[in-house]
Amino acid sequence: MHIIALSELQFHNYSNLHSKKNYKQSVEYAKLKESNGYTPLYLGLVDSGNNVHAATLILEKKINNKYRYGYVPNGYLIDFYHLDLVKTFTIELKSYLKKLNYVYIRVNPYINYQVYDSDFILKENNSGIIKELENLEYNFISNTSKYKMVLKATDIRSTYQNFKRSLRRNINNCLKKGITVYQGGRQDQQDFLNLVGNQERYQKIIELFQHPQNYFEFYLAKIDPETYINNYRYLIKKEQLNNDRLNRKLKDPRIRKTKNLVERKMTSDHLLTTYNNELINGTNILKKYPSGVIISGVGIIKNQQEVIFIKECYTNEFKYIRSVPMIKWEIMKKAIMEGYHRFDLGDIVITKNQITKTGYNGNIIEYSNSFDLVINELLYKFNGFAKKRPK
């Protein structure tokens, strides 16, 4: 077997059929990165019958007029656990890239390195793959691993019930505030772009990712202040009746003043205060935005295999409402009905006191660190490329 250059169409067709397909190993992503100065290189490992057994997109940049390096986003389109195939691919790839004066390529394999539950308890350990790749002369670049929250859903009801209580409460609070979610169309593109930080990038994503195998969609959350006000008027009226009833019991000398009764009255008082504050907030929003206001958005890519959440955005004014989880849930409900069962909810942030996105109760996937495949050892060491990251 040997490496050949694939046409854009050949790579497009192969990548769409591969079990490891992902939006970064795609023609669409290559075109997106061209605006950052990268040149796409599509390569495939073929046998004597010209059948493709593995392929990769390499995003190439020149170091000078002669030498170049490459970046392989989300790794090769290959079964990394088929070690003989990975070995053959690596040997042939090094030979091919040497002729093109490559110094090295940096690979971010799309491998489930470690799998944890939402409480960060280890469920699956695939760390042995690191040693196998090192045996094939891949240089391990430490401290570059990423964590994502991945959820496998079967149906709407059980998926929602499996969410942690805090997330379900957040979604319900958004409903009380009159927040609705809708899929954006062409007429809503600017509303979405106004929310994101890099408008030019997402304008290109909207334009490029229009193939059914890599399709970008965006969804927006909007507050209807009249619904917000009406919901809390109803809740105040309902809770006031409960509060009056509890108050009568506390004043009735014939009724024992138990700890439970006192606590229920205190809870009711607290709810009334909260509801009245929400009513004031809703009234202020109505005065400022009588027709409602868009407060957040989410961008996704669907590839007929999974839904990948690639962008969360919101206005600073309404950041406190935390409406993004509600958008995600509405997207998931729609996608489940369309036959999707795997949801990549995006990168999670791990700090000393918090791990984000755990409310979805999915699996935390730690993707393997980066590896450098060195083509020209002398130039690689001389220029200190091991300490650098592709821009």
Regions found by a protein language model. Give the residues of each.
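Active-site donor-binding loop signature of nucleotide-sugar glycosyltransferases
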Residues: 74, 186, 223, 362, ...
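Active-site/acyl-donor-binding loops of N-acyltransferases
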Residues: 8, 31, 119-158, 286, ...
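A conserved beta-strand-loop-helix scaffold within acyl/acetyltransferase catalytic domains
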Residues: 3-49, 54-65, 114, 136-143, ...
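A general structural signal for short secondary-structure boundary/capping elements
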Residues: 103-105, 192-195, 343-345, 389-391
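Generic structural "secondary-structure junction" signal
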Residues: 79-80, 165, 373
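Acidic carboxylate-rich catalytic motifs and surrounding loops in phosphoryl-/glycosyl-chemistry enzymes
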Residues: 109-110, 148, 183-187, 311, ...
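Acyl-donor binding region in acyl/amide transferases
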Residues: 67-141, 290-291, 304-360
